[in-house]
Amino acid sequence: MKASPHRPTKALIRLGAIRKNIQQMGAHIPEGTLKWAVVKANAYGHGAVAVATAIQDDVDGFCVSNIDEAIELRQAGLSKKILILGVSELEAIGLAKEYDITLTVAGLEWIQALLDKEADLTGLTVHLKIDSGMGRIGFREAGEAEQAQDLLKQHGARVEGIFTHFATADEESDDYFNAQLERFKAILASMKEVPELVHASNSATTLWHAETIFNAVRMGDSMYGLNPSGEVLNLPYDLTPALTLESALVHVKTVSAGACMGYGATYQADSEQVIATVPIGYADGWTRDMQNFTVLVDGQACPIVGRVSMDQITIRLPKVYPLGTKVTLIGTNGDKEITATQQRHSGMQRLFLTQFVWEIPCMVSIQVERF
């Protein structure tokens, strides 16, 4: 799949907004703290290479989820450090050394599997992942982390960092967060030698628990202008959303009362209505269950009526508008703005409660051209 430039559906990325958010984060955290930009998942849908290139002078390194994302940045000419946050396949060792990419080590069995294959770890740089309560990957006991560090160093690898990830930093209650923090601190305190880089702060932790920062932070959703909590917690400073998602009206018609829209005929007009078609759908990341979400036309909120199709939606207009009229799904239209957070909440009445604010930009597919 590649971008489709010959249709009106576009993602407009304000790289200046991302840089501004980074600068504000820098003013919020202790001086000297390293800033790592999380550009996994195509930079949360904003375009990994374009974003990383624009901000390379503002950050100390990049975080990605896998070796292919890391290599993409290297092949684009990015020279800053790159950390893979997930577990890599054993075969990625050679590529990691070739492209100077830092791997995450999360278990003794992974190290042993490498040693069983007689892999050469000389020149490999790694960070140890601690599972302090997220429950995904990582060492849960200090002894295991220490053993891993010893094994890696014995076989030529450089253990540069150690990190964890908080599960509830964006929630009102601090109880579980504090329990995780104490667990992580206890593991660090029990180690004979703590690696140089210690990081536990994702965006939420950095925003609302700045006093817990070690010596590096990982900037994800906040870098793109997204509130990690949705609207649960107030931000300590304003964030500027970087993504605008736009399309245009390609078909407009007036229908009579009783007319149905979309698969399953889930919407039926209760009066004469103006219905328009917009060329965006679930193949673009605007998912099927976003029926009833709102878009902006001429500064007015217009609901999506009928189920979202693969590459089209139907919306209800207040009046007839010309073909080509701009439709804003995320961003500003006239004197109105609709954000990813507001889109998330517009589906609340339909029990769309599991949608996190950063999922929406992440889902914008590669076929939507980015500018």
Describe the function of each predicted region.
Residues K2-L15, R19, E69, S88-L90, ...:
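Active-site anion/phosphate-binding pocket segments in diverse small-molecule metabolic enzymes
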Residues H28:
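Conserved PLP-enzyme active-site core in the AAT-like
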